[in-house]
Amino acid sequence: MDLSIIVPVYKVEPYLRRCVKSLMAQTCENYEVLLVDDGSPDSCPKICDELAACTDNIRVIHKANGGLSSARNAGLFAARGDYIGFVDSDDVAAPDMFAIMLTAAKTSDADIVMCDYFRVLRTGRRWLMTTALRPGLYEKADIIKYLYPSLIMGENLDYGPLLSVWHCLYSRKFLNQYHLAFADDIPWSEDNLFSAMAGYHAKRFFYLKSMGLYNYFQNPGTITTSCPPGAWNVYKRMNRYLENYFSFRSDYDFQRQLQLHLLYYACHVIRMERQEACIRNVLKDLHQAHFFDHFRMPDVSLKLKIQLWLMKHQCARTLTFLLGESPCRSY
């Protein structure tokens, strides 16, 4: 089998059929869709079974709730395809997404293929998310030169990490070779950790530039539009994972990126929570770690520069006022 597409499913009733419809419309052949029901308490398990009954291309895995990492790992364990793709169950793949990515992977013998994607707002407005990288094949020397500088986090904190699993295709042989899987105790944004580790080990990487083959929807309640309780502690734990993995690499210095990664998620938590006590908690952690003592501020938008300046000078009350206070949640 050429391809396994892994779709974690949890509380996505309004979007699940739309997502699976886009996967059943793929122009490639010889592929399977793995719907991993992560103990969803709504009608999603029933919808998964109904969809699977209509085609041999779909397999359903029902499991106890363990989080997004656990669901993706269950899919990885069950996958039969030579290549692995990941699709979030509230998103939509273009009909030719995986045919194009598979062709690129096979002809270039790439470990990872990445495409650009569309970010889609609730209003329906969308725009293409691309990078400064050139299109085409990168071998190891080029990966180190061009991908490593933003592998964990680039200088522009107005954007997130370079790689995410849902717009990449992976060779299963490559993933198995380096024992790459998701950290079960990181319940969200775990693909940042997985993607950075995969990108580090890749020997051949192919970039499909300006081809928006994936539609990433910013739906209400997602991690991009809200912060679950305990978010800051999870992001700190993820950063420690990255530090343990990347701090002592002899082929590249990732220290600056590790700082930027933590700062990016500190900014995210502050913007989403907007409550003075919660903001003070984040700022206290950064200052106790002497984060800003010798930190060179990145080149970002004026709005973010103001937020970073206020964070550096521990202006929690001003941040709360500017962002608009919301109810506090536990960290």
Give each language-model segment a name.
Residues 11-25:
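Short, well-formed alpha-helical segments that are part of the catalytic scaffolds
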Residues 15-17, 42-51, 92, 96:
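Acidic helix N-cap motif at the loop->helix transition within catalytic regions
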Residues 84:
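Short aromatic/hydrophobic "clamp" motif used to bind/position activated sugar donors
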Residues 63-79, 89-92:
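Glycine-rich, basic loop-to-helix element that forms the pyrophosphate-binding segment
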Residues 272-331:
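Membrane-interface aromatic/basic loop that binds lipid-linked glycans or pyrophosphate carriers
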